Amino acid sequence: MKRTYQPHKKSRKTTHGFRSRMATKNGRRVLAARRRKGRASLTV
C-alpha cells in the first residue's frame, strides 16, 4: 500500500507557502496567530 505522504516541493509551496497564506483572509489569520505565538518559522 502506498503511503499518504508523497512529498513534492511545488504542492507544498502552493498549499502552505507564504504567498498562498497571504492570498486569503483566513490565511492571514494563520500568519497573525503564528506571529503572536512567536514562531521561528511562519510558513514552509
From Swiss-Prot:
| GO biological process assignments | translation
Q: Where is this region: Disordered?
A: 1-26
The answer to whether the entry has keyword Transferase is no
Keywords tagged on the record: Ribonucleoprotein, Ribosomal protein
**What's one GO-annotated cellular component?**
ribosome
Q: Does the keyword Kinase apply?
A: no
A Pfam match is Ribosomal_L34
Which terms does the record give in the GO molecular function aspect? structural constituent of ribosome
Q: Which InterPro entries match?
A: Ribosomal_bL34, Ribosomal_bL34_CS
Basic residues composition bias: residue spans: 1-19
Give the family per the record: Belongs to the bacterial ribosomal protein bL34 family.
Protein name as annotated = Large ribosomal subunit protein bL34
Species assigned in the record:
Lactococcus lactis subsp. cremoris (strain MG1363)
